[in-house]
Amino acid sequence: KGCGTCVHCSTGWQQLCVDGVKEVFGVTGHGAHAKYMKCPANTLVKLREDISFKSGAAISCGTGTAWGAIDRLCLRSHETLAVFGLGPVGLSAVMIASSMGVNVIALDTNQKRLNRAKSFGAVNILNPLKSDNLIDAIKDLTKGLGAHASIDASSSPEARSQSIKCLRTWGKACFVGEGGDVNIDVSNDLLRRQITLIGSWTFSKHGQYACAEYIADKKLKVDELFTHEWKLNQAKEAYELFDKQSDGKGVIYPS
């Protein structure tokens, strides 16, 4: 919740409020672990009948994050996108980009996640632990040039560095994973290859609407991102599993 009137709030970016965010639901304000949730009506996006509430939850956080990054990258069909980290955000990026005709290279150290990425449309999958030289492996898949764009959804310093190094000249890298650090050679990794580095944090209400419409129109199976379902009284169990970061995405039903 922002001031509601500044340049960001008035364009659907309340989380970037010039005066500072007044309330963050689930952090400084009440969250959604209840049957109902009170929030500003002007932040809501009405879901179409062909989108489940479960998919809607993903669109608001996770799938929407991927959508925001892909939108910033301005990808075209037949270009190559390398996605580092295949949690819910990374897998969503694979699903959305693949549906746009983008050739996706999906990267993760977890074979189960790599297999899911393949089922969501990734053309190639790579496990960094099984590659002697990951950058060369990506170049081998792109006629020696490198990827047109990359998304890092892992927060791993090494993956972030690789997501830049794997790009061709004029490539674009987008970081969406929170926290962590990165070590890059500004001249060789960025300037002398004309690389664009983008930071993308969430997206606007209007972006949320566009994402929901696209998913419905393309009939993307966002529900398949979810691997677990719980009731509200199972929240403790849900968070214990979540902390292990070993599975996909879960949803808690309030009723």
Question: Where in this protein do the model-derived segments appear?
Answer:
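Rossmann-fold dehydrogenase core element
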Residues: 172-174, 185-224
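Structural motif
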Residues: 56, 84, 107, 153-154, ...
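Short strand-turn motif at the edge of the Rossmann-like AdoMet-binding core
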Residues: 154, 176-180, 200-203, 226, ...
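Glycine-rich phosphate/adenylate-binding loop and adjacent beta-alpha elements
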Residues: 1-44
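Structural detector of well-ordered beta-strand residues that form the stable sheet scaffold
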Residues: 45, 82, 105, 126, ...
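Glycine-rich cofactor phosphate-binding loops and adjacent beta1-alpha1 units
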Residues: 73-75, 111, 115-196
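C-terminal hydrophobic helical "lid"/dimerization subdomain
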Residues: 161-165, 205-255
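Mid-domain Rossmann-like dinucleotide-binding core that forms the NAD(H)/NADP(H) cofactor-binding site
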Residues: 42, 49-131, 136
